Curated annotation (Swiss-Prot):
It holds the Pfam family NDK. Its main location: cytoplasm. The keyword Cell membrane does not apply. ATP binds at K11, F59, R87, T93, R104, N114. SMART domains: NDK. This is Nucleoside diphosphate kinase. The active site is at H117 (pros-phosphohistidine intermediate).
């Protein structure tokens, strides 16, 4: 099987709960290698650009407001079948539908404040990684 990369965000509500280390531990326990990570505080322009596909939808302004309300942690994760495995670990977007033991079941507060984001395809992962990480900021793990 081919090694893939996926993109992950720990959103402001989960950062505020001080569970970054717990989430990273769950990534690693699930077999992911963290090959890039950083904390940042999105500007309105960055949030609008990242979520541009949702512009015009009723929840867009609230999503931008939430995503700029505090720091986030963006990461690049690597493993076999990374995109699907990461999405399985996150759980359903709506935490009311998230299975017990998933990150959203454990750390989400609402549909918008669902604690985490994960790429939905290999193509989205590549685009999202490039949005936040410059060349050389992702370090392949060889050991």
């Amino acid at each position: 099987m081919t090694i893939e990369r996926t993109f992950s965000i720990i959103k402001p509500n989960a950062v505020a709960k001080n569970v970054i280390g717990s989430i990273f531990a769950r990534f690693e326990s699930a077999g992911f290698k963290i090959v890039g990570t950083k904390m940042l505080h999105l500007t309105v322009e960055q949030a609008r650009g990242f979520y541009a596909e949702h512009d015009g939808k009723p929840f867009f302004d609230g999503l931008v407001e939430f995503m700029t309300s505090g720091p986030i942690v963006v990461s690049v994760l690597e493993s076999e079948n990374a995109v699907q495995r990461h999405r399985d670990l996150l759980g359903a977007t709506n935490p009311a539908n998230a299975l017990a033991g998933t990150l959203r079941a454990d750390y989400a507060d609402s549909f918008t404040e669902n604690g985490t984001h994960g790429s939905d395809s290999v193509e989205s992962a590549a685009r999202e990684i490039a949005y936040f990480f410059a060349e050389g900021e992702v370090c392949p793990r060889t050991r």
